A protein has these predicted regions:
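Local beta-strand N-terminus motif with an aromatic residue
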Residues: 45-46, 72
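GHKL-family ATP-binding catalytic core of two-component histidine kinases
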Residues: 39-41, 58
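A short glycine-rich, Lys/Arg-flanked "PGG" loop and its adjoining helix->strand segment in the class I
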Residues: 61-75
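Conserved Class I S-adenosyl-L-methionine
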Residues: 119-208
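A conserved beta-strand element that flanks and buttresses the S-adenosyl-L-methionine
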Residues: 49
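Conserved class I S-adenosyl-L-methionine
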Residues: 74-109, 128-135
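Short catalytic micro-motifs in class I SAM-dependent methyltransferases
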Residues: 52-56, 79
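Class I SAM-dependent methyltransferase SAM/SAH-binding core
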Residues: 1-38, 62
């Protein structure tokens, strides 16, 4: 919803009727369907966009193939590169998070098996990002102490116990350790945390 352009015809796809019900008034029409069974004709759209969602699909190859099938021009996917380095949150406090994400996010090679050659474009995250994914609060460390913030980040839900990491972060913020280690980040307007735009500009020929 947050990334839907308003200057062209858009059709959104959501697997959940509940998610469709949460779309704001005036949003583009939405169709309830899984990624692996898009109810559209081949080449129905000029472009397809998937934002931080592919790693949730139980059949990623099937979903990517469907994106390719319904798209005439390009497929664009926002994802996270499993070979990217962690950042202070995962390096100092929650190393399990990056291990979990590396196991579930698709690699470039995996996507190219279905989409053909792709281009990876770095997407630096601005310091005031409001979208609430894992790296959004890299310059606002206190936010990660908020259970509501963590509740919107799916990887936290996969951890067995977040309390030890939270306690270390809380202590380091209180005694100034975080500021001594990472205070330089407060001067940065944006940071490359491994998020990538995957662009497949020329779909492979459709299967007969």
């Amino acid at each position: 919803g947050s990334y839907e352009p308003t200057d062209r015809r858009v059709v959104a796809v959501e697997p959940s009727r509940e998610m469709i019900g949460q779309r704001p008034a005036g949003a583009a029409p939405a169709v309830q369907a899984p990624a692996t069974a898009l109810p559209f004709a081949a080449g129905a759209f000029a472009a397809a966009l998937a934002v931080l969602t592919v790693h949730h699909w139980p059949d990623r190859a099937g979903g990517l193939a469907e994106l390719r099938r319904v798209t005439r021009d390009r497929v664009v996917i926002l994802t996270w590169a499993p070979d990217a380095a962690g950042f202070w949150l995962t390096e100092d406090y929650f190393p399990e998070l990056v291990a979990i994400d590396r196991a579930i996010f698709p690699t470039r090679e995996e996507m190219e098996r279905t989409l053909g050659p792709v281009e990876l474009r770095p997407l630096p995250i601005p310091h005031d990002c409001v979208d609430g994914f894992l790296g959004a609060y890299w310059r606002r460390p206190h936010a990660y102490l908020d259970a509501v913030v963590r509740g919107a980040i799916s990887t936290f839900g996969k951890m067995a116990d977040v309390e030890p990491g939270l306690e270390r972060l809380r202590r380091d913020l209180d005694d100034g350790t975080w500021m001594r280690r990472h205070g330089g980040l407060l001067e940065r307007a944006e940071l490359d945390l491994g998020y990538r735009l995957v662009v497949a500009p020329t779909p492979l020929p459709l299967a007969a």
